[in-house]
Amino acid sequence: MRIAGIILAGGQGRRMGREKALVPLSGVPLIARVLALAPQVEAVAISANGDPGRFGLGLPVLPDRPGESGLGPMAGIRAGLDWAAGIGAEALVSTATDTPFLPEDLVERLAAAAPAHAQSFGRDHYTAALWRVATVPRIDALFAADERRIARLSGGAVAVPFDTTPDPFANLNTPEDLARAEDRLRQNAP
C-alpha cells in the first residue's frame, strides 16, 4: 500500500500563545520534530492555512478546501486525502504538529491494522491515524451533516495501542506542556 503523510498544523495555538508548529523544543521547531515521520511514508505535506513560506521546509502546504477553512483537523485530513490521491497514494497517515515524540513504527503498525488510529493508555488519538483515500465520501457526508468530530470519521477503525512510557502521543498545548517536554528531552539525553 502506498502511504503519504500529513502534519496537521492548522490550529490557532491560543493556549500556547503562538503558532505551535513553529514553537522550538530544544531549539528545533515542533513541526521539524514531527517531520521525523517522513522516512515512514512516501511523501509528506503540511495542512495549514495562511502563508506557506513560514514553515521553510520545502514541503507542500495544503490549505483547507474552500468552505472548510477553520473546521478543524477533519478539514486538514480531507485536503490531505485529495493530495494523497493526486500523488497515487492509497492511504494517508495524519499526525498533529504538537506531538513531537511519535513512535518510529507508527506507520507500520497503523498500516497493519488499517484503517486505524493510535491509542495510548486507553486514550484514543484520532489525529494519529491511517485513512484510506476511499474515506473522502464519508468525510464529505459528515461535513454535509455539519459534523466535525474526527472521532465520528474514525468509526470502525482499529485502535492500535502504543502503551510506552512516556506517552508517545503527549501533545504540547501550553507553555507548561512545553517545559515538561524540555525536561523529558533532558532526561533522555545521552
UniProtKB/Swiss-Prot annotation:
A single MF term (Gene Ontology): GTP binding
Chemical reaction(s) catalysed: Mo-molybdopterin + GTP + H(+) = Mo-molybdopterin guanine dinucleotide + diphosphate
GO cellular component terms listed in the entry, alphabetical order: cytoplasm
Pfam families attached to this UniProt entry: NTP_transf_3 (PF12804)
S-S pairs: none
Function: Transfers a GMP moiety from GTP to Mo-molybdopterin (Mo-MPT) cofactor (Moco or molybdenum cofactor) to form Mo-molybdopterin guanine dinucleotide (Mo-MGD) cofactor.
Name of the molecule in the record: Molybdenum cofactor guanylyltransferase
Source organism of the structure: Rhodobacter capsulatus (Rhodopseudomonas capsulata)
